[in-house]
């Protein structure tokens, strides 16, 4: 191979590097073994993996012809590949039997196509990968859940085996190793040890240069102030940028699985700033990063201390008794619960409208996240929650990254640990790694009763503070925005949620995924969206009758707000400054809750400083 043609010109230096490499590897193994402690959650995942592959094996035993045909096809392809490799080694031209899919960035290095040896390795791997995928897909006697889980675990196995993940079969890494005389591997092992030490369970790879960003300094910089605080939230009121503002204020309810500033990363892509610039008086809930002390917080507590407390704060700050809601992800699920609760307690008028961004209310099809919610895995999570009082946000991040493992795990594994290079500075990836913990009382209930048992869609299926709620009784006008490629909140599931309220509903489908499709500023003119005034029972029928539009959905939403009368556009008032009402200025936005990291919550940062 091309990389192997280079000579090692200094054997003594190579010997020294191998000694250093050996010492780093030994230290890494000691670190790894020290983390090998009994873990109910990890054990439950292993049980689920065993169950999934056993189900697949039993399916193949019931259909031996499928196994035989698949093996025969793979052997035939391998023979053709061997003949091709022999011809290429003799200098002949060759046409590849298989090539990477369009979105596969692992094999972008030129050597994968120009070097016959590397090309043969790549094709051999792709043939195996495609065979496994096809085989699992043809196991039609498995239940949908069994097939989903087996497909996920098989994909994890196959992608872990990619030749790009190993030194000797990755041309980029081989070149780097020869150029640096192995220093890249020494540096990579050092980075791996550091990341392992900073991970709760599994491995949280470093995705970005974290020193390049500081919350409140160069991200989350929209001007405003914290005007209210309780044990769970800080309520931020943002400073106006227009002389007049809409009479009805706007409350943003973000998710608490991660931090709110994905909606306020930079001024040019900030949804918060855009809303303020349109004339909204924007309030936003900043959730506390919880620890063991918050273990008993319930879904009802999140509702009372979150949206309902925020409504009271907004009335004190502005004098307005109602507000518009703009919610996101699990924040939207909580908001839907809140709408039903307010309706049942005859306070539904406190919300003039409600918007759900990438939100699940009907959990019948959770997508691949369902892999983490099989009964063995869920029982393991519940045991861990009971033991610790919280779910470490780094564990959640690791799980979510495995839903896009090649982009969000293995690419950084190769860059950081095999090439020994620093990741680039990227604000979105900084946010992605700035996680939050999840309290036991809330998260365990959410996973069991909503994700697994889908009780929120049942009339009276959920009881909050003694009140049985029913989403079908909510008459508040609703705007649903789902995104076509969302792997967290699948758009078909979001659509089924839109069929629940009895009030007027507008459903819009955006392009792209869970983040980019939601945070899609108009000036970029990207992704597009679809609209359809009808709401048939089937999501595919809705899409077939939908009209495509270019650009961002944000202006469409703004037009819906104005034309619907939800902002009282004919009753503009003077701009409201934070602190201008009955609520005092507590501290500048974005506040301290959002700046609190997981290590700080758990006392790890202090321990590290003491060790130094």
Residue ranges and their predicted role:
Residues 480-482, 486:
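Short beta-strand/loop motif that positions the catalytic acidic residue
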Residues 294-318, 334:
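Alpha/beta-hydrolase active-site loop
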Residues 264-282:
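Short amphipathic alpha-helix adjacent to the substrate-entry channel of hydrolases
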Residues 245-256:
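Short beta-strand element of the alpha/beta-hydrolase
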Residues 487-493:
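Conserved alpha/beta-hydrolase "acid-adjacent" motif
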Residues 141-176, 316, 320, 334, ...:
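Alpha/beta-hydrolase-fold enzymes
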Residues 447, 497, 501-536:
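Catalytic histidine neighborhood in serine/cysteine hydrolases
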Residues 1-234, 245-246, 283, 349, ...:
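Amphipathic, low-complexity, repeat-rich surface-exposed segments
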């Amino acid at each position: 191979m091309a990389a192997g043609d280079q000579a090692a010109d200094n054997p003594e230096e190579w010997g020294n590097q191998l000694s250093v490499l050996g010492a780093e590897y030994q230290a890494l193994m000691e670190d790894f073994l020290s983390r090998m402690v009994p873990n109910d959650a990890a054990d439950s995942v292993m049980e689920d993996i065993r169950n999934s592959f056993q189900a697949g094996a039993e399916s193949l035993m019931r259909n031996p012809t499928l196994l035989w045909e698949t093996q025969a096809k793979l052997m035939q392809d391998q023979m053709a590949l061997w003949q091709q490799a022999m011809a290429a080694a003799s200098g002949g031209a060759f046409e590849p039997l298989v090539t990477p899919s369009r979105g596969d960035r692992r094999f972008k290095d030129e050597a994968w196509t120009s070097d016959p040896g590397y090309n043969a390795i790549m094709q051999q791997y792709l043939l195996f990968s495609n065979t496994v995928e096809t085989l699992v897909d043809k196991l039609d006697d498995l239940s949908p859940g069994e097939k989903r889980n087996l497909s996920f675990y098989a994909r994890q196995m196959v992608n872990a085996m990619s030749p790009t993940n190993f030194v000797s079969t990755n041309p980029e890494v081989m070149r780097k190793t020869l150029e640096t005389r192995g220093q890249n591997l020494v540096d990579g092992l050092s980075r791996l040890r550091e990341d392992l030490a900073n991970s709760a369970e599994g491995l949280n790879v470093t995705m970005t240069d974290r020193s390049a960003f500081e919350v409140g300094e160069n991200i989350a910089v929209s001007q405003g102030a914290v005007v209210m605080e309780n044990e769970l939230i800080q309520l931020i009121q943002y400073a106006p940028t227009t002389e007049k503002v809409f009479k009805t204020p706007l409350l943003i309810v973000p998710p608490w699985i991660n931090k709110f500033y994905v909606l306020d990363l930079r001024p040019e892509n900030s949804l918060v700033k855009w809303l303020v610039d349109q004339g909204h008086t924007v309030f936003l809930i900043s959730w506390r990063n919880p620890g063991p002390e918050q273990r008993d917080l319930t879904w009802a507590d999140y509702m009372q201390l979150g949206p309902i407390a925020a409504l009271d704060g907004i009335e004190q700050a502005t004098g307005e008794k109602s507000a518009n809601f703009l919610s996101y992800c699990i924040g939207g699920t909580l908001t839907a619960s809140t709408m039903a609760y307010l309706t049942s307690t005859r306070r539904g008028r406190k919300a003039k409208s409600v918007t759900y961004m990438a939100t699940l209310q009907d959990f019948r099809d959770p997508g691949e996240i369902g892999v983490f919610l099989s009964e063995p895995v869920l029982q393991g999570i519940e045991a861990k929650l009971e033991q610790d009082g919280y779910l470490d946000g780094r564990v959640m991040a690791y799980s979510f990254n495995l839903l896009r493992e090649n982009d969000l795990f293995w690419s950084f594994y190769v860059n950081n640990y095999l090439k020994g290079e620093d990741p680039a500075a990227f604000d979105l990836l900084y946010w992605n790694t700035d996680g939050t913990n999840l309290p036991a009382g809330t998260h365990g209930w959410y996973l069991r009763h909503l994700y697994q048992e889908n009780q929120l869609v049942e009339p009276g299926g959920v009881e909050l503070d003694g009140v049985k709620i029913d989403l079908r009784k909510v008459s508040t006008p609703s705007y649903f925005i789902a995104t076509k490629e969302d792997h967290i909140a699948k758009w078909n599931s979001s659509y089924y949620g839109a069929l629940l309220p009895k009030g007027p509903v507008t459903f819009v489908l955006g392009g792209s995924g869970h983040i980019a499709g939601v945070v899609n500023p108009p000036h970029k003119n990207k992704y597009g969206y679809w609209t359809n005034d009808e709401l048939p029972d089937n999501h595919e029928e809705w899409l077939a009758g939908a009209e495509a539009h270019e650009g961002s959905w944000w202006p469409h939403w703004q037009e819906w707000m104005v034309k619907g009368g939800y902002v009282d556009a004919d009753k503009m008032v003077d701009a409201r400054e934070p602190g201008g009402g009955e609520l005092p200025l507590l501290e500048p936005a974005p506040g301290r809750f959002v700046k609190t990291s997981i290590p700080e919550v758990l006392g790890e940062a202090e321990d590290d400083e003491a060790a130094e």
